[in-house]
């Protein structure tokens, strides 16, 4: 139970590993400040997956995890988008959250602050009823946050589907973006996912503040614009990068010997390939990537999942149900056995990116993976699949210069020749060297912003001070 004078913070991510992982890092950062008590509140439509439990088990024992009863989504079609399921799970968890807060209130251990993620704004109703201060931790970047804050206005002023917009959208401080590159969730305005996201973004103004997982060296213009005061815009705190930097990451066992294999490779010679906890490729695309890697002649570690026609099919459970090796081209493993290591479902990504033999990362550009690569100074090949990954790619390729973009053909398939081209460009070409230098600069920027006097540390300190003050105010009210 939280001590009366100790600020008690409850944090509640939406379902999916990509949302859970940064919230776990936020919880760890909070308890490093020994005057905070943290409770992780976990919602879902099923009991937590093995991968989720392993991440939660890595938390310090001082952080309590509370699992809410599964939300009832029996009326939601199986074809519904993952965002629909995630947002409905959050909203339909409100009764269970209310019951939890009621119980904590009786025990005098109610949190002073509730931090939800981008899909959890409906939890504000419960927070306000219990006089708990509502905040958002936006686990993506400042460019996408700016888009989310702009979405209600965009919805009012644009009548067509966004992909038909003839001019790029220009939000202050952000990379201009064409409608077809907007995040997937808004590409069909009749879909429930769009309506639910719009509903959430309209409620962002109710938050007392928004923490964003980015930093000024990476997005100086977007962060500056977000921090300009405006009506109905909460204070934005850039506190990133919040990533797992542990050299002994207990979440993920190295069952397939990735690190010992890397130990035997030359310095800066290995390309790491992973599409995150949620990404999958179609059978045809899986095959083209495999052949392209073999034909490139470069060393690689490739994390594979069984192909699927749905690119986000492993979003809620990153482990393949079928044997992914059976989908590899005949002879692929023999052809690449001297230079490649193929790993099913999951690998110790943080340690792989930190290893001196790793020289590049072919990634879906999920924000957690992007930050992990930047923190370790590893240049990127951008292969966006779903969610806001096209927007992340635009930021990294066109604005920051930290990634090369891989290009699909008109049929949507990245051909083997393109795989060979971009892999060689990163690992051999002048363009790859320039990107490598830029990422090394960003890595140095990370050290600066997270230092004692760094901008992210100061920003985090500001929000912590607000939370301490709010807890003190609550204590004074209850003592009278």
Swiss-Prot record:
The protein's name: UDP-glycosyltransferase 72B2
Cross-referenced Pfam families: UDPGT
Family under the similarity heading: Belongs to the UDP-glycosyltransferase family.
Binding annotation for UDP-alpha-D-glucose: 277, 347-349, 364-372, 386-389
Keywords per UniProt: Glycosyltransferase, Transferase
Enzyme Commission number: 2.4.1.-
Keyword Transferase appears in the UniProt entry: yes
Gene that specifies this protein: UGT72B2
Annotated InterPro entries: UDP_glucos_trans (IPR002213), UDP_glycos_trans_CS (IPR035595)
Keyword Manganese: no
EC top class, as a word: transferase
One GO location term (cellular component): endoplasmic reticulum
Gene Ontology MF terms in the entry: UDP-glycosyltransferase activity
